[in-house]
UniProtKB/Swiss-Prot annotation:
Region (J segment): 120-134
Glycosylation sites: N90
Chain spans, region D segment: 116-119
Coiled-coil boundaries: none
Organism expressing this protein natively: Mus musculus (Mouse)
Assigned keywords, A-Z: Adaptive immunity, Disulfide bond, Glycoprotein, Immunity, Immunoglobulin domain, Receptor, Signal, T cell receptor
Annotated S-S bridges: C42-C111
Signal peptide: 1-19
Protein name, entry field: T-cell receptor beta chain V region CTL-F3
Ranges for region V segment: 20-115
InterPro entries hit by this protein: Ig-like_dom, Ig-like_dom_sf, Ig-like_fold, Ig_sub, Ig_V-set, TCR_beta_variable
GO cellular component, one term: T cell receptor complex
Any single biological process term in GO: adaptive immune response
Amino acid sequence: MAPRLLFCLVLCFLRAEPTNAGVIQTPRHKVTGKGQEATLWCEPISGHSAVFWYRQTIVQGLEFLTYFRNQAPIDDSGMPKERFSAQMPNQSHSTLKIQSTQPQDSAVYLCASSLSTGVSYEQYFGPGTRLTVL
């Protein structure tokens, strides 16, 4: 009996997923009404100091929104600033807020993180948040 129990325990530990294995985005799906506020969360990979936000639609494809390095906004040239805002208050998360949502805001919003070392940035993407505005 003891060897079988030990075998089961070993299997359980082998199947356990590591924490902080990748970029985490919440919620995965969000449905909201026109004129509401939507807040999207991103948790970068531990140790990564750069966070990027993108929006992806069928018509426009992947669009850059904003980029943070060491919590400071570096480039927000892609942000529709009248209703969109992003923050990175600490190294553990970033938020993207959309005020007064419109149907054209319906898209998949992607967050990526990077070590931010050297000249190039190898980005690791989260699963995305699918926002639907009715």
